[in-house]
Amino acid sequence: MRIEISSDNPLEHATPALVVGCFEDERGRVFEECDAALGGCLGRLAETREFTGKAGTTRLLHTLGKLPAERLLLVGLGKKADLTHERLRQAAGHAMQALRTSRAASFASTLPLASSLPRATESVAIGSLLGSYSFDLYKTKDKEQRFAFEEMTLMAPQPEREMARAVAEQAEQICRGVQLARDLVSHPGNVVTPGYLAQAARELAARHALEVRVYEQDELESLGMNALLGVGKGAAEPPRLIVLRYRGEGAKGRPVVLVGKGITFDSGGISIKPGPGMEEMKTDMAGAAAVFGTLEAAALLRLPVDLIGVVPTTENMPDGKAFKPGDVLASLSGTTIEITNTDAEGRLILCDALHFAQKFKPAAMIDLATLTGACVVALGHEASAVLGNDQRLVDALKKSGDETGERLWQLPLWDEYGEGMKSDIADIKNAGSRDGGTIKAAWFLKQFVGETRWAHLDIAGTAWSEKARPYSPKGATGVGVRLLIEYLRRK
């Protein structure tokens, strides 16, 4: 979808649809002027409470030639004092849903004019772009009749036009990263394999002149990455370790390292999962997808940062060669791990990757993983969990999460949680009792980060949505990309 910026009077702008934001407690200039042009019908809707301006509501009207805009789409913003960037993004997303239903491929939006928030244009652009997303690559019927958005015109005052254009371009670049992450998670597991991710990394590197290295199985064996190799023993395709590096112009200091869990399909292995819902286990590489998407967006934005992405990737499958409960694996760090549950495999591939990443001497290391079902039990689908060994890093990520709507909730990481991870025959075991499962998984990872400033994001409940949300359709959300870009921009 193309983005244009216009300083036209909204009432004089010809468009298939004009989006107008409406507050519950204030009508606003554009609303009043449109109401006058339409003979008071908008005011009548408000008086009869057929449209109240409540957040999340929309109302589409045909102007019947009384305005250059063919249709008027009213979008509720709630009470003016409660307006936030997230509410603007959601309003833009609700508008996209209504426009899709009415098949308005091109439209103009006055939503940026409804707010004095400093980044209103960016919020509206992001909500609109992400709300326009659909994934229908594998559908073969009625291709010629499928709807696709073509052009969005954002209205901005003349003095702010060029700034709005630059902000909209940045929003588009961020959304390209989110869309890459969504696409990778949406593909089926027979397409996205470890080899596919390796090729996607090479293509990403080629697009933006990034450094890339893919460690193949023989190299992993030479390095001693036996935790990663152990998980991949039951898979037909060998595991890989993918390393990408973006060196932004003007970057100073040590790099930031992102580590993303890349289990391209998780059957649970010998500790096999129940059949119902197993098809969603193609999403167990959402952490890897977020790392790829963040690198894409950072490169497009030309952020002045040194950013490294590390992605351990494999499938977790049952097989005669698969690792088993009771096995002991010697990790890259030398720590020995008793396997008590082969379905606790994500932490195994991550522990080798985290130890490996220390060689870059990072200023901060952040891992993202669909790691535990316990996180979904604790937080549902409205927030990701964050845990770490550095409170300043955790606080910075939480602030970025609040700003972008990708909210984080901090869980404790006290040493007592490690008591249940002690093994009788090895240094530690990979899974303890079910209680506090998210914390225990993070405690396990903490054993492999050394003194590096580190934070862990458990995105198990937020990487995939079983329902459509205002600016995210049912399916992959691309969570983590916008949060991390905001964190990097603030550095």
From Swiss-Prot:
Pfam families in the record: Peptidase_M17, Peptidase_M17_N
Organism lineage string: Bacteria, Pseudomonadati, Thermodesulfobacteriota, Desulfuromonadia, Geobacterales
A single GO BP: proteolysis
Protein name from the UniProt record: Probable cytosol aminopeptidase
Compartments where located: Cytoplasm
Molecular-function annotations in GO: manganese ion binding; metalloaminopeptidase activity
Residues involved in Mn(2+) 2 binding: 261, 266, 284, 345
NCBIfam families documented for this protein: PRK00913.1-2, PRK00913.1-4, PRK00913.2-4, PRK00913.3-5
Family according to the record: Belongs to the peptidase M17 family.
Species, as recorded: Geobacter sp. (strain M21)
Function noted in UniProt: Presumably involved in the processing and regular turnover of intracellular proteins. Catalyzes the removal of unsubstituted N-terminal amino acids from various peptides.
Name of encoding gene: pepA
SUPFAM superfamilies attached to this UniProt entry: Macro domain-like (SSF52949), Zn-dependent exopeptidases (SSF53187)
Binding residues for Mn(2+) 1: 266, 343, 345
Principal localisation: cytoplasm
CDD domains per record: Peptidase_M17
Membrane listed as a keyword: no
